[in-house]
Amino acid sequence: MTLTDGRIVDRDEGNHQWEGHQINSGIDWDIWNQKDGFKDETHQLFKKPVVMDAFCSVVRVLDLDRVFVLGGNKNMDSTNPDTQTATMIYNVKDRKFELSTKLNDKRWYGSVVRTGDEKMIMMGGQDYVSSVNSIIPEILDLKNFNKGWSYLNKAKSEDLFGDTNNTLNEWHYPRAFLASDGNVVGISYNKIWVMDSRDD
């Protein structure tokens, strides 16, 4: 794979390529119009459209016009800012990137689920710099971004979003799904759980 600065990187080369190289950052965006095939002109490259490192973030399509990018990264090998609490909206129609409401906790390798009443819950992840796990999920009303993110304090769990015995990494991309009864069902490593939507 050839990077935008001309460097060539091999796929699946392991730790020797991970440690210390400069591509642990997701700061450039390539928007591809797949309807027009695989030609170079079907891609539009945006170099640093906003100050957000989206490496290890989560991306969700909100509607036909907006894509939501949540959580970010702090590349320890660069001078890039710490954007682990950042969120961003990509406007498909206008092809514009705009920073959105910040998360309360750092969510490197976090996960999200969208509820039936148009809310987004983010859970898991950690602060990459300090290795402090984000054990309290937080919620955003997608109909009212201005209210910002709120903690779901009753859902706080070291067991489900921490790192039991420093071996299981439950914080690492816990999987979550919206069940037919409106509750959130999740998997944290080898643990299955349910979040009651009727109780904050």
Q: What positions do the PLM features span?
A:
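Kelch-like beta-propeller repeat domains
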Residues: 1-200
